[in-house]
């Protein structure tokens, strides 16, 4: 780690404390994040963990070197919701072909959407259907060790059997007892379960449903439960390539550094992942640090289709933003709206709940417009290294304090420190070189406008406002409007300070 980079500290849901991050192997830093179930358009709540952990991925690459960080984000392409969508959308196709159409088209849309949000591609994106062998092998190991059992062609994991053994306890992540978890959980009641809290590792496929050879001596075809998929895929991508896995008896080699996802996944999904992986691999921890982002609301309400406020990422990208006018290049429009959405989300710390509003999205687009305008005016070039991003890096090293990082970007803009602004934006995934260099983007088509002169007149107007000389402040506003420049006043949500932006009109 470079001496100029502060110690990275991350909040660990497992310990409920902010911890200094110490990778198991600084040359092989490894992170796993639960990805999408590809049956429908991803909504803006799905976008939040993608953005949050992309920022962490960028920060880890900055600190340890891009070649030393592996980021795995899975794709769930085996699920009852996928089956239902396939039957609905393609009733005339053979079922497996219909499922393939749903998963391939939905995944392609997801990849396009999250790319528009400014995210890097993860190092690997394993698909559940590609790792059935690992799932079966892990299930067989769990049965052999007495923490899973076969019943009516199902294989189930027994939390009570896990807790009867020496080693990690079920419930350590959620910090709840089995009775407390049962009281607050929605569990499937089934006669073949020994205990209500037992959960499915494998289940038989019905006629016509996709199915694979089953583990544990079961003769019928079946398919995996949701939780075992992530345990198997993280093992395949973050343990086995580095000497871990089912053939390894070294507990440290069977752990990776960071596991992330939304707060809604703490229980049961992540709790069950830990149980499966620890019991199968003989380790105390599946991952050393568990990170979870907070919930998202829309205009102060829970997002739901029944309330009519269900917003997909594609909705945000398609709506565009007024700065681009009638710009016909959909890719460019997507990327501009995506960057604005990214900045909007990063203005709330990842562990806090976020309130998505159209106003904040528009304000974020305005702020990006100002930042890019300065970079263009000063001829900023895409940086090869981020040697001037220290203030942003320091903020992000404090448990991804994105608000403090954005404050650093605002300060760099205020003092016209172009290197700090541009490199800091790059570290946060807010820099698209196209918007810095392209000459044909309507948002920056201001050849006849002197941005520096306008900034000076805005500063003069603010001085008049502070002196309560309203007549002179209005005079400057009206003169600029006559010249085709419209001013817009707003307030910094954190400081209350007046912010004035401008745009060309007429």
Curated annotation (Swiss-Prot):
The broad enzyme category this protein falls into is: ligase
Instruction: List localization entries.
Output: Cytoplasm
HAMAP family associated with the record: Cys_tRNA_synth
Task: Note the InterPro entries from the entry.
Answer: Cys-tRNA-ligase, Cys-tRNA/MSH_ligase, Rossmann-like_a/b/a_fold, tRNA-synt_1_cat_dom, tRNAsynth_Ia_anticodon-bd
For this protein, what is the EC number?
A: 6.1.1.16
Give the similarity note: Belongs to the class-I aminoacyl-tRNA synthetase family.
Q: What is this protein called?
A: Cysteine--tRNA ligase
Cofactor dependence is on:
Zn(2+)
């Amino acid at each position: 780690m470079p001496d100029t980079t502060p110690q990275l500290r991350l909040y660990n849901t497992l310990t409920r404390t902010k911890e200094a991050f110490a990778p198991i192997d600084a040359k092989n830093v490894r992170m796993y994040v639960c990805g999408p179930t590809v049956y429908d358009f991803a909504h803006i709540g799905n976008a939040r963990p993608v953005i949050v952990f992309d920022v962490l991925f960028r920060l880890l690459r900055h600190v340890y070197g891009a070649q030393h960080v592996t980021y795995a984000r899975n794709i769930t392409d085996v699920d009852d919701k996928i089956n239902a969508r396939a039957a609905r959308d393609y009733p005339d196709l053979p079922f497996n072909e219909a499922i393939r159409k749903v998963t391939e088209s939905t995944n392609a849309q997801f990849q396009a959407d999250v790319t528009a949000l400014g995210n890097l591609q993860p190092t690997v994106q394993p698909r559940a259907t590609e790792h059935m062998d690992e799932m079966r092998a892990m299930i067989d190991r769990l049965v052999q060790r007495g923490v899973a059992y076969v019943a009516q062609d199902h294989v189930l994991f027994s939390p009570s059997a896990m807790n009867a053994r020496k080693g990690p306890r079920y419930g350590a992540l959620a910090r709840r007892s089995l009775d407390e978890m049962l009281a607050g959980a929605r569990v499937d009641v089934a006669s073949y379960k020994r205990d209500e809290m037992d959960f499915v590792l494998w289940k038989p496929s019905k006629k016509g449903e996709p199915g694979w050879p089953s583990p544990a001596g079961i003769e019928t075809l079946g398919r995996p439960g949701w939780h075992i998929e992530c345990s198997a895929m993280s093992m395949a991508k973050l343990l086995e390539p580095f000497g871990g896995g089912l053939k390894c008896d070294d507990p440290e080699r069977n752990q990776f550094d960071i596991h992330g996802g939304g707060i809604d996944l703490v229980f049961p999904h992540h709790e069950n992942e830990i149980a499966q992986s620890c019991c199968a691999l003989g380790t105390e921890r599946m991952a050393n640090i568990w990170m979870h982002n907070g919930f998202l609301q829309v205009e102060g309400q829970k997002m739901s289709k029944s309330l009519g406020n269900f917003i997909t990422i594609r909705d945000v990208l398609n709506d565009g933003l007024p700065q681009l006018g009638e710009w016909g290049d959909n890719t460019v429009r997507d990327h501009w709206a995506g960057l604005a959405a990214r900045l909007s989300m990063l203005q709330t710390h990842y562990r806090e709940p976020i309130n998505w509003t159209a106003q904040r999205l528009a304000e974020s687009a305005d702020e990006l417009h100002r930042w890019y305008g300065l970079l263009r005016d000063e001829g900023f070039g895409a940086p090869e290294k981020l040697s001037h991003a220290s203030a942003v890096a320091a903020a992000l090293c404090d448990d991804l304090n994105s608000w403090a990082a954005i404050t650093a970007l605002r300060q760099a803009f205020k003092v016209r420190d172009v290197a700090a602004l541009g490199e800091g934006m790059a570290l946060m995934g807010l820099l698209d070189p196209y918007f810095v260099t392209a000459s044909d983007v309507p948002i920056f088509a201001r050849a006849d406008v002197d941005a520096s002169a306008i900034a000076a007149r805005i500063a003069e107007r603010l001085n008049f406002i502070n002196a309560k000389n309203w007549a002179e402040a209005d005079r400057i506003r009206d003169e600029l409007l006559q010249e085709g420049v419209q001013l817009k006043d707003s307030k910094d949500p954190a400081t209350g300070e007046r912010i004035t932006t401008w745009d060309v009109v007429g």
